[in-house]
């Protein structure tokens, strides 16, 4: 009897070896950018077998500053690989031809004239008077390097074809979907941000998927640039709830009884002027009636005096005596029941701190960092950080009252190089390089917790070090706002780990930099301290810039993207048979 079947002739297929050749895909990119936005500075198609080595040199300058502002500005570059199958569910059938070899799916696209008209609508604004303004070419379409409609402010027409350009060339939707998927998986704060729709099942012409109106275009797949969130600190890492899940109840069970009353029912009345309370005599005294009024709530009248109206918000009915229980019983929980409740509470707390993404859940509970490819998400490849330094520009021309000699303005400048990343693609997809510029946060409107301790248990005690999450008061971030709430003290902002205030020091500003010299810092003023997307989103911090318009780009950056590629294709495309 044969020991094993060794004939592999019919169990394997010989595949041809594809030679690899080196190519230099390096290119420069020069553009203008905003603070806090996510820009795709690299978007390169990758093939199975490709080996890319990528890094980016950069030189960044700020637009003119009204002062040599203090604060840390940093430019971040992150590299990702996004497989096509994650952004188009029919990709595998399309690229293989399906089981029949005749699959008819068409890759998702938008005709260029529709895409450009949409970009025009996104960057347009009607102030209600019929006067339209048009933002610069800084949307997502332009950020990908695609051309947009040339436009002159004097001849705006809503959804019109401008300057006779009306090409219907199909523009692939896959890079746009990949950009949104990266934001969903890496930049979105799942505690406050909803996941953006990718609609990976849609293919072919997507024109009918989007209504031709500015708001719908802006919210759609091809809309505006997405925003970065502030780096995590005591406030920006706060949780909206102390745990991710329902409250865990102590496992104490029993049969419910009844409460019996055998005593006079009395009325507790509060005086609005003095704040004092008075308990009436028995409500059921002779000649005393209790009734409900249409507007005043509870009313009391007697044969002695007129009706006495009592506001509902300032009264309580109470029994003076005679309250007893009957028929009830309570059964104590077992030690195992208590253990289960404590373990479940701990489970919910870890889930809240770790995050709701699958990769975060595995890391939080099992301390295992799964690879991005295994979890079907964009793969993070690496990146780098560049500091942007701000220096002074001295006024050395003639002296006048508005700009005396020696007056200081500012200029920002930075040079950097990202870390080098190497990646071998095993399937079709896109290499992304995502750039963002964000300042380090500074705070000056709140009162730290150590200034408001009122009892000894407000201080640190080792016995309490492992209790659950503790509250962050709104007054720690903003003590009050004339626009929203004049007194934020005692109002919940979010939750942080126990005694986190002892382990963190926030950046602060003082003196005139809080007011008249506010243009000397990149600090932002917070008027509505609620834990939501608006608070965590990096805004356009315009304080130090000479031009305060939020629609004006504040940075000019030169990128030298160095990409060395080893690709499965001939170096020369010489015709042959």
Report each predicted region and the residues it spans.
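Intrinsically disordered, low-complexity segments
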Residues: 1-577
């Amino acid at each position: 009897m044969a020991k094993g079947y060794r004939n592999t002739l019919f169990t394997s297929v010989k595949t041809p070896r594809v030679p690899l050749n080196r190519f230099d895909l390096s290119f420069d990119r020069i553009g203008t950018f905003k603070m806090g936005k996510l820009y795709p500075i690299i978007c390169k198609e990758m093939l199975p077998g490709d080996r890319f080595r990528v890094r980016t040199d950069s030189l960044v300058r700020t637009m003119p500053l009204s002062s040599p502002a203090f604060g840390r500005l940093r430019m971040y570059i992150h590299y990702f690989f996004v497989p096509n199958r994650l952004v188009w569910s029919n990709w595998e059938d399309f690229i293989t031809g399906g089981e029949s070899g005749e699959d008819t799916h068409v890759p998702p696209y938008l005709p260029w004239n529709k895409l450009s008209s949409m970009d025009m609508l996104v960057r347009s604004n009607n102030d209600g008077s019929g006067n339209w303004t048009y933002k610069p070419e800084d949307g997502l379409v332009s950020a990908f390097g695609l051309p947009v409609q040339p436009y002159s402010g004097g001849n705006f027409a809503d959804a019109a074809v401008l300057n006779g350009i009306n090409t219907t060339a199909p523009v692939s939707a896959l890079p746009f979907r990949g950009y949104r998927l990266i934001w969903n998986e890496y930049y979105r704060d799942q505690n406050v941000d909803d996941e953006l729709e990718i609609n990976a099942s849609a293919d072919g012409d997507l024109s009918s998927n989007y209504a031709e109106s500015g708001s719908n275009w802006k919210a759609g797949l091809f809309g505006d640039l997405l925003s970065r969130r502030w780096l995590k600190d005591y406030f920006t890492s706060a949780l909206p709830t102390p745990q991710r899940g329902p409250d865990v109840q102590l496992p104490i069970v029993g049969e419910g009884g009844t409460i019996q009353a055998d005593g006079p029912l009395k009325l507790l009345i509060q005086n609005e002027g003095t704040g004092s309370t008075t308990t009436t005599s028995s409500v059921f005294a002779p000649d005393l009636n209790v009734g409900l009024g249409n507007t005043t709530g509870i009313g009391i009248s007697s044969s002695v005096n007129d009706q006495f109206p009592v506001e509902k918000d300032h009264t309580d009915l109470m029994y003076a005596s005679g309250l007893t229980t009957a028929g009830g019983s309570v059964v104590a929980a077992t030690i195992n029941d208590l253990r289960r409740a404590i373990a479940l509470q701990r489970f919910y707390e870890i889930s809240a701190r770790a995050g709701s993404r699958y990769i975060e859940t595995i890391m939080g509970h099992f301390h295992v960092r799964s690879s991005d490819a295994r979890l079907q998400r964009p793969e993070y490849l690496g990146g780098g950080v560049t500091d942007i330094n701000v220096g002074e520009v001295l006024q050395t021309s003639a002296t006048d009252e508005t700009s005396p000699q020696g007056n200081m303005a500012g200029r920002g400048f930075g040079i950097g190089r990202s870390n080098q990343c190497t990646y071998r693609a095993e399937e079709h997809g896109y290499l992304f390089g995502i750039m963002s510029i964000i300042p380090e946060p500074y705070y000056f409107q709140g009162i730290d917790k150590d200034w408001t301790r009122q009892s000894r248990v407000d201080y640190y005690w080792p016995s309490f070090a492992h209790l659950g999450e503790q509250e962050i008061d709104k007054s720690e971030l903003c003590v009050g706002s004339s626009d929203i709430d004049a007194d934020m003290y005692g109002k919940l902002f979010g939750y942080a780990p126990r005694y986190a205030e002892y382990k963190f020091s926030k950046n602060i500003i003082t003196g005139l930099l809080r007011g008249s010299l506010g243009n000397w810092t990149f600090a932002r003023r917070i008027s509505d301290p609620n834990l939501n997307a608006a608070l965590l989103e990096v805004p356009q911090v315009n304080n130090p810039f000479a031009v305060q318009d939020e629609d004006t780009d504040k940075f000019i950056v030169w990128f030298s993207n160095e990409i060395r590629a080893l690709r499965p294709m001939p170096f020369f495309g010489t015709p042959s048979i």
